[in-house]
Amino acid sequence: FVAGFIGSPQMNFLDATVKVNGKDVTLQVGNYSLKLPENKAKALIDGGYDGKTVVMGIRPEDVTDDATAFPESTVEAKINVYELLGAEVFLYFDVEGFNMTARVDPHTTSRTGDTVKFGLDMTKVHVFDKETELTITN
């Protein structure tokens, strides 16, 4: 968990429910099902996390406003703040009550007030045990 607070902006954290279907594992964040890659899925299956709530962490650079980049793991949200910082753009938005930040291409056309489908790179996601705060997979 501590690693999530290193860097600026810090990692996005969302509570998620683990859903196992054979070898497939999704993290359910409200109405969104985010499919985990096989290596990360195995850690959750082996740990007996089916049906349990975990904490999903994803860094802002692993969230894009190009949903086609990660079609199996998208969330839709209204942009609350657009922040241009030199060669970087940060987009701030809420997903199912959780604050999120995306660091996106500075040429983005996304702006404050726009509703955007964001793609999450699930190969880069970190999953933590909600009770012990220990890393399950990263």
Enumerate the predicted regions with their spans:
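Internal alpha/beta loop-helix hairpins
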Residues: 1-32
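Short aromatic-glycine-enriched beta-strand elements
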Residues: 23-26, 86-92
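Glycine/charge-rich catalytic "coupling/switch" loops of P-loop NTPases
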Residues: 24-80, 99, 109-138
